[in-house]
């Protein structure tokens, strides 16, 4: 069986945000799947999805500092029509990716003990973000 839903994440400031609970809350009400896969596709080119540490928020802060240093806003980019944070946001989105494929068992995501779903908001003012969630399973 296949199920699909478009969900909208609340607006977040620039940085990395743990969104596991927000995702699972917005997917509540879907029929339970004994064994399956959840595919998440972020419909934006200036944000990203990744799995990482779900407990210590300093990991998210360190990750943001790393990417601000590695892909700075003030570099000489040709694509700068939407501001200094636009092209760096596209680069970070491409490096980290915009989709995740996650196993589901007995109606629950099967993540490691310390794993959580992160949204990387790479724009200073990114706005709400849309994700297409596709659940396949039996």
Swiss-Prot record:
Belongs to the UPF0047 family. This is UPF0047 protein YjbQ. NCBIfam families: TIGR00149_YjbQ. It holds the Pfam family UPF0047. It comes from Salmonella typhimurium (strain LT2 / SGSC1412 / ATCC 700720). InterPro entries: UPF0047_YjbQ-like, YjbQ-like_sf.
């Amino acid at each position: 069986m296949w199920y699909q839903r478009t969900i909208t994440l609340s607006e977040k400031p620039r940085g990395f945000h743990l969104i596991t609970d927000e995702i699972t809350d917005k997917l509540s009400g879907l029929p339970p799947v004994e064994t399956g896969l959840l595919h998440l596709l972020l419909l934006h080119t200036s944000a990203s999805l990744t799995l990482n540490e779900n407990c210590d928020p300093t990991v998210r802060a360190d990750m943001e500092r790393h990417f601000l240093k590695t892909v700075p806003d003030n570099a000489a980019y040709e694509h700068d029509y939407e501001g200094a944070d636009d092209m760096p946001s596209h680069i970070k989105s491409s490096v980290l990716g915009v989709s995740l494929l996650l196993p589901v068992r007995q109606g629950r995501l099967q993540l490691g003990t310390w794993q959580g779903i992160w949204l990387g908001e790479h724009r200073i003012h990114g706005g709400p973000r849309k994700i297409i969630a596709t659940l396949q399973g039996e």
